[in-house]
């Protein structure tokens, strides 16, 4: 909390996070129209847009095509890796001058539902006990790469893929937002080999949930060692059901 601030000063400002490379891709004229529609609506409903991975773009310009992300919005560059901009972002959403909920959206809920129905959301957790002890990095890296390969071969576009491994010797997380993209890796990369690994996989992809699940299950069976405690769900988001429509404020 900022010096001199009290609990009564705190407010909540809706914010959206935007991956710069993924955002630039969705803003191209040849991008998938449904995915671009969802992206634009998510930006529009936010009072503050947070552009992530600032550490990859020292000049804060981002990849080509990024500029429209912040058009019409308050925007901040953030880096979860270095902490750049995080304190300023927290101060802004809690104590800043931006009016919370100041935007009224005109949403085509039928199109929104169609766009979300094109996505498969997969959540997977399991325990891996390899035949020989191995480090978390050597579990996460090959598994994420293998998932990328089989999803690409199945012509399933990745929107977001994250693999997290927790072991007694340390943890590692790797994630990316497109097929073939270099993953962002965090954690204890030099952790010692471990005999037991608890893994989480979060996947958002464009495709039929049953097909996405089949592909991921197939790769799960390829892991060497004993796999147990599998919890897997894969589904398309249900259609939004707004409780009420708020009339647009008079100018």
For each feature predicted by the language model, list its residue ranges.
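Acidic-enriched, low-complexity/disordered segments with a strong bias for Aspartate over Glutamate
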Residues: 9, 19, 25, 30-34, ...
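Structural motif
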Residues: 54, 80, 204-206
């Amino acid at each position: 909390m900022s010096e001199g601030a009290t609990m009564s000063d705190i407010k909540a400002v809706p914010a959206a996070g935007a991956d710069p490379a993924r955002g630039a891709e969705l803003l191209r004229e040849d991008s998938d129209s449904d995915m671009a529609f969802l992206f634009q609506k998510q930006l529009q409903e936010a009072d503050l847009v947070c552009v992530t991975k600032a550490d990859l773009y020292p000049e804060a310009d981002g990849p080509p095509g990024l500029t429209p992300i912040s058009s019409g919005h308050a925007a901040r560059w953030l880096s979860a890796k270095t902490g750049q901009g995080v304190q300023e972002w927290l101060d802004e959403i809690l104590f800043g001058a931006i009016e919370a909920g100041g935007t009224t959206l005109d949403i085509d809920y039928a199109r929104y539902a169609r766009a979300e129905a094109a996505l498969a959301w997969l959540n997977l957790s399991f325990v891996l006990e390899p035949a020989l002890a191995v480090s978390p990095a050597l579990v996460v890296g090959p598994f994420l790469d293998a998932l990328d390969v089989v999803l690409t071969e199945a012509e399933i576009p990745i929107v977001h893929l994250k693999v997290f491994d927790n072991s007694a010797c340390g943890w590692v997380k790797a994630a990316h937002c497109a097929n073939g993209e270099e993953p962002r890796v965090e954690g204890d990369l030099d952790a010692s080999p471990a005999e037991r690994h608890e893994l989480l996989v979060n996947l958002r992809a464009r495709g039929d949930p049953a097909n996405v699940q089949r592909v991921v299950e197939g790769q799960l069976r390829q892991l060497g060692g004993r796999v147990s405690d599998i919890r897997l769900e894969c589904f398309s988001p249900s259609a939004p059901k707004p409780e009420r429509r708020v009339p647009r404020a008079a100018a």
